[in-house]
């Protein structure tokens, strides 16, 4: 397919927006889902200061901006800002006219119905797209791994969910959702760094902590043992240089932060960890298909990028499951983008072409068409 008519695939995550053309093997544009507004009064006349900045530009000017994420826990909470992000995606990042391309959007499972209706409405009414579709993120990740059966543990910045899929069908009764993801881990790391005497408070400083988390954190195979190692030696300590040149040292925070995924009580949450949630999700499925799910547990999303997470999942699920069960955790190296890659695959399938919601269908039925056409 040529770029002229290629479908656009936009995976709007709570933390990062991934966008590009169907048929490509990676997104062309990846930028933070941030809208920033100046905190101060502009004094330089004629500088062309804007009243809002999106994505990387907001990130680079973060020192003078208040940064807002319009998507929280996978749900769009601020539609005006969301429109700015989409506008930025089409016109600045991809440099295309949305009225000339079908658009595939993604959403978290168990999202409010109104959320996808509004997405549909904005695409057709604000951007005049000829056709659009809303796909479930985890299903796309499974496509990207080349499977049609498996359970996907998808964890991004705003929401984590486990979605069992059998022969291409998501099993809605067994989908579980956990509102604990990357952003909560960033906040938790901010908190435990404060205990070490490093104070991070502003929205801009939170981005620094996110970078520390992405570069230095890992998942311990045995948490208690790792805590012992950290207490008795400095072998686990790493240093990080802040933008102002100050160097900070972090030790057990490196694995205490992502440990919250397995022990949400660290964050004061009552929910089960990601290993138990995955197990519970499998147990809600028919007894005949559990074996296939255990053997095809696929990790996806940026919050599954910690070193050691796959081994730890293997260990935890093995201890929960029947002893004879074969358990396989699949952690593709490109899992940060597997939702987008799955969308790219789906939108370029010839069989998918009749699945699009067309402008005409939208004009006839209104936004509710999305529930009938998109699973």
UniProtKB/Swiss-Prot annotation:
Question: What EC number(s) does this enzyme carry?
Answer: 3.6.4.-
PTM note says: Oxidation of Met-44 and Met-47 by MICALs (mical1, mical2 or mical3) to form methionine sulfoxide promotes actin filament depolymerization. Mical1 and mical2 produce the (R)-S-oxide form. The (R)-S-oxide form is reverted by msrb1 and msrb2, which promote actin repolymerization. Methylation at His-73 by SETD3. Methylation stabilizes actin filaments.
Kindly state which keywords UniProt assigns to this record, in alphabetical order: Acetylation, ATP-binding, Cytoplasm, Cytoskeleton, Hydrolase, Methylation, Nucleotide-binding, Nucleus, Oxidation
Methionine (R)-sulfoxide occurs at which residues? 44, 47
Q: Which reaction does it catalyse?
A: ATP + H2O = ADP + phosphate + H(+)
The record's GO CC annotations read: actin cytoskeleton; cytoplasm; nucleus; plasma membrane
Which Pfam families is this protein grouped with? Actin (PF00022)
What subcellular compartments does it reside in?
Cytoplasm, Cytoskeleton; Nucleus
Q: Which residues carry this modification: N-acetylmethionine?
A: 1
Positions bearing N-acetylglutamate = 2
MF annotations from Gene Ontology: ATP binding; hydrolase activity
Major localization class: cytoplasm
- Chain positions found as Tele-methylhistidine: 73
SUPFAM superfamilies xref list: Actin-like ATPase domain (SSF53067)
Question: Hey, which family's this protein in?
Answer: Belongs to the actin family.
- PANTHER family found in the cross-reference section: ACTIN (PTHR11937)
What job does the chain carry out?
A: Actin is a highly conserved protein that polymerizes to produce filaments that form cross-linked networks in the cytoplasm of cells. Actin exists in both monomeric (G-actin) and polymeric (F-actin) forms, both forms playing key functions, such as cell motility and contraction. In addition to their role in the cytoplasmic cytoskeleton, G- and F-actin also localize in the nucleus, and regulate gene transcription and motility and repair of damaged DNA.
How it assembles, according to the record, is: Polymerization of globular actin (G-actin) leads to a structural filament (F-actin) in the form of a two-stranded helix. Each actin can bind to 4 others.
State the remark under miscellaneous: In vertebrates 3 main groups of actin isoforms, alpha, beta and gamma have been identified. The alpha actins are found in muscle tissues and are a major constituent of the contractile apparatus. The beta and gamma actins coexist in most cell types as components of the cytoskeleton and as mediators of internal cell motility.
Name-wise, this protein is Actin, cytoplasmic 1
Q: Which organism is it from?
A: Salmo salar (Atlantic salmon)
Tell me the name of the encoding gene. Answer: actb
């Amino acid at each position: 397919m040529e770029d002229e008519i290629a479908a656009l695939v936009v995976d709007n995550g709570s933390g990062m927006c991934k966008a590009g053309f169907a048929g490509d093997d990676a997104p062309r544009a990846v930028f933070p889902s941030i809208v920033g507004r100046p905190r101060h009064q502009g004094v330089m006349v004629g500088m062309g200061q804007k009243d809002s900045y999106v994505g990387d530009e907001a990130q680079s000017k973060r020192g003078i901006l208040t940064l807002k994420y319009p998507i929280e826990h996978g749900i769009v909470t601020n539609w005006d800002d969301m429109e700015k992000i989409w506008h930025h995606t089409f016109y600045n990042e991809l440099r295309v006219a949305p009225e000339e391309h079908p658009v595939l959007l993604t959403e978290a499972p168990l999202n409010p119905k109104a959320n996808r209706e509004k997405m549909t409405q904005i695409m057709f009414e604000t951007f005049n797209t000829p056709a659009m579709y809303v796909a479930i993120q985890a299903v796309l990740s499974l496509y990207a791994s080349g499977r049609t059966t498996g359970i996907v543990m998808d964890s991004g910045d705003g929401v984590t969910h486990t979605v069992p899929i059998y022969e291409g069908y998501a099993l809605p009764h067994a989908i579980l959702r956990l509102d604990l993801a990357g952003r909560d881990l960033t906040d938790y790391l901010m908190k435990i760094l404060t205990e070490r005497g490093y104070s991070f408070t502003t929205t801009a400083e939170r981005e620094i902590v996110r970078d520390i988390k992405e570069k230095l954190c890992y998942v311990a195979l045995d948490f208690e043992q790792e805590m012992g190692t950290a207490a008795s030696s400095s072998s686990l300590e790493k240093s990080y240089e802040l933008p102002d040149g100050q160097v900070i040292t972090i030790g057990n925070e490196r694995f205490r932060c992502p440990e919250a995924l397995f022990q949400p009580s660290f964050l004061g949450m009552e929910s089960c960890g990601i290993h138990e949630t995955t197990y519970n999700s499998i147990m809600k499925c028919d007894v005949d298909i559990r074996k296939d799910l255990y053997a095809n547990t696929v990790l996806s999303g940026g919050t599954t990028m910690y070193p050691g997470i796959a081994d730890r999942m293997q260990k935890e699920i093995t201890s929960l499951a029947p002893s004879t069960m074969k358990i396989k955790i699949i952690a593709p190296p490109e899992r940060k983008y597997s939702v987008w890659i799955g969308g790219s695959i789906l939108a370029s399938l010839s069989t998918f072409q009749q699945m699009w919601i067309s402008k005409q269908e939208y004009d006839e039925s209104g936004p509710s068409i999305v529930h009938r056409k998109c699973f």
